[in-house]
Amino acid sequence: TVILFNGGGNFGDLYRECQDFRLRVIEQFPNNRIIMFPQSIWYEDESLIAKDAAVMARHNDLTLCARDKWSYNFLKEHFGKNKILLVPDMAFYISDEYLNKYRECVFWGQKLYLRRIDKEMDFSTILDDLRGFDIRDWPSLERRPICLLILRIMKRAAYYLQKITCLTVLQRFVNRLADEYAIRIVRPYLLKRGCDFISPYSEVITTRLHGLILSILFHKPVYYINNTTGKLSAYVDTWHLQDILEVSPYVDKILEKHVD
């Protein structure tokens, strides 16, 4: 069985619970092939780097994918005993056939300032009172979808069932059911919700990398504001997206155009 870890921006200690989960799986399945989809890397506590690297180095077949050059070089330096790849974010693997359904659904004049509200937001870069912009965060983070709650309940049930020896068959069934639910219900729902969110806008300013990526895929004018770890600029620089402008150097131009 090949084990796949989701990509994103949670490798390191910014979201430590995600990293701890990865480490537990890596330790529990030392002989299974494991592939981590493209990640951005960030450590506040540098003492954790060697500890994490030691756990991963003991695995027999672990591939770590980075989605920007800074993260790739970091992994090559500190996690060099594993196979390291530089790969675009998984959102770029959404099919053109799927994206084409949304590319024409634009309401001209509607503009989005996608402003994250979590610990990755650099509050020194906040733009207030943008004229004509909707100020939103990612919809599934503003309001947790019911399907994610159901999936969490199913996974929690499977976790507790595994502790009861006589119910291991039921535990496997619930776990398989949860996996099918995630693949057939949750994933399509979250993808559709993200596309429904971004596609109507004719212009986007974003503090989230996936807001940037979806805007690119939908061929929209987009500016970005870096998060606290610099992952947006790292991604833009890595994949030579020089026509995508960072707000900070152009803030006067943006404000002159859009702020009351």
Regions found by a protein language model. Name each.
Residues 1-260:
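Active-site anion-handling motifs in enzyme catalytic cores
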